């Protein structure tokens, strides 16, 4: 039957017409009171039509008789129960409505009609049979079931969805007009819509992604060369400590492999000093990583993001352990508090210092184990109080060691700049 409507009639009964769906069921009076509620359908007396033309004529006349301006239509808030969905009696006759547009007068230019007719085949004209069309994906299985009971169930479910105001506005496309009734139409079973999803993603890389990848590779290569340069300069400085008069040529020559003259900081793999050179550079790399870790810890400690509990708390407040993730002052931002000594579901909450919690903790830990560090406290306080003298001392040290540091510091400049940016923006 394609997508044409199936309309069922009985010679001696009345056809109950369901609005906004386009399917007719025969009944003298609503047999199923739980489903066919009074007032939600239109009725008309039909003489049993013998031909398709008579059926079309009766439907058109019925449309013209309905006063669409005063018709209340399908109640918006009507809820249909999902019980007693019996199909029409088997004695009813089934006719198929041929496609023919039916325009309802009085409706705001809402198109009413049926699906276009199917293209006739060439099987009866002596030509070769038309190859069968591959079946389309069934997107509305509840509308095409052969079992009429399940068909009626899907019909009632779809009818309930049409009773909401949102579906009415989406159907008519006029958000500024209040359409309380759903205008009845004779329409076919909805055909599978053409699915228009997102466009397929192109497997090719976009220009912006390619530029970002190239820029990232360039940054990695730059940092790697700088790290190698830093390791080479530190290796040179380390080796120079053993030779105050200057670094001589490498004496670790291998008798089996003749190597040219070179410095101890650039030994080839065939030289006996090659393993010692890379051992020194491995230690240098570990020291650089340790320096970065210390910088990160100092930064987090200065921001107050390290939850380190003090050794000797000054204030105590007993709160519930589950709520001990906030500070004593009921602040939901760092610093947090520490929960110790849980007893009977409660604990002692000690506030963490706002900054330098790790430094204070390490200093207190060192003082508890090395009492002689207490002697340095007055000296440190004195150095902090005479900042001018400390500045002069620092200037003098830089002036004395400046020429020697100029050959070592340039490779560190990018790392210093990176540390400064991290310190400022984090």
Curated annotation (Swiss-Prot):
- Residues covered by region (Pre-S2): 144-202
Task: Please give the residue ranges the record annotates as the region Pre-S1.
Answer: 2-143
User: Where are the bilayer-spanning segments?
Assistant: 210-230, 282-302, 375-395, 402-424
* Carbohydrate attachment residues: 346
Region feature Disordered, mapped onto this chain: 107-142
One Pfam match: vMSA
Lipidation, kind N-myristoyl glycine: residue numbers? 2
Q: Could you tell me what this protein is called?
A: Large envelope protein
Q: List the gene name.
A: S
